Amino acid sequence: MKAQILDEATAEFADAIARYESIEPGLGIRLKQEVRAAVEWIAEHAELPRARPKGYRRVNLKVFPYYVAYMIWDGTIWVLAIAHAARRPEYWIGRRPGAD
């Protein structure tokens, strides 16, 4: 399945990369690589993570305290957020494809 990332998620992800790069050069790049690997895994195995009661699925990153929240809609994977696991739980829950 093809994965699309909502504009809001892309902007937040860019902020996270910049924040990690400011902490240590190269750290933001490692975050980007880990998220890319997670999205590729999701594209191959989208239905493996169970759907949560609110209709989304989530894959935790292995190194960074982030997760990729997504939903499958109309045959496409929509990444709703690349969210920090300990900050603002489900702040992105109202996001939907086409609502950008």
Cite the ranges covered by each PLM segment.
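Arg/Lys-rich, positively charged N-terminal/basic patches that mediate binding to nucleic acids
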Residues: 1-32
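Basic/aromatic recognition patch in beta-strand/loop cores that engages polyanionic ligands
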Residues: 37, 44-77
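Enriched for short, Lys/Arg-rich terminal
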Residues: 29, 67, 71-100
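Short, well-structured alpha-helical segments
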Residues: 32, 36-39
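Short, charge-rich, low-complexity interaction segments located
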Residues: 22-24, 45-54, 87-92
